[in-house]
Amino acid sequence: MKRLVTGLLALSLFLAACGQDSDQQKDGNKEKDDKAKTEQQDKKTNDSSKDKKDNKDDSKDVNKDNKDNSANDNQQQSNSNATNNDQNQTNNNQSSNNQANNNQKSSYVAPYYGQNAAPVARQIYPFNGNKNQALQQLPNFQTALNAANNEANKFGSNNKVYNDYSIEEHNGNYKYVFSFKDPNANGKYSIVTVDYTGQAMVTDPNYQQ
């Protein structure tokens, strides 16, 4: 009987020991599983953070590329605008020059004598030189005539009438010589010169024909 009790007691202790080992093994396996899950979760978290960082870096690169492209577009637009402005300025200058040339051509008046002109200036200063060469140096005929008429009217009658013109040459420099008749004084003329600079000067306000 004692042996039976002793055997049962030994069996109970053995089974209890086996059960404890099994529980410890289960606890160990559970800890391993928990650790593996934790490491896997940490890895996922790290991977997610890395992906976010990579995406952020990619976004920065895209934004930088967009800024660079925008800057290039703005620079190209600025260069294009500057080129267009320069071209417009050139066209405007050409247009102004063409307009000035057209005005000069349209306002050009060939030298002429007054109505029923007496040979006054031509007699005082007969010109036998190269007329075309002289006219190239002298100012526009009508402009010179108007300046001479205004100067002549400063002396005596202020309504003098254009009579005739001639050209005077001295050391390669030319002058217009104009005569203006005084309607209030029979046979009297004002003699006015205009040089190549356009300067008018009365040389004789009461020339008697």
Curated annotation (Swiss-Prot):
Lipidation (S-diacylglycerol cysteine): 18
UniProt region (Disordered), positions on chain: 17-105
Chain intervals with Low complexity compositional bias: 71-105
Domain of life (superkingdom): Bacteria
Keyword line: Cell membrane, Lipoprotein, Membrane, Palmitate, Signal
UniProt entry tagged with the keyword rRNA-binding: no
Subcellular location: Cell membrane
Membrane-related topology note: Lipid-anchor
Secretion signal, residue range per the UniProt entry: 1-17
Protein name, as recorded: Uncharacterized lipoprotein SAOUHSC_02650
Residue numbers with lipid attached (N-palmitoyl cysteine): 18
Organism from which the protein derives: Staphylococcus aureus (strain NCTC 8325 / PS 47)
Extent of Basic and acidic residues compositional bias: 23-70
Disulfide partners: none
GO CC field: plasma membrane
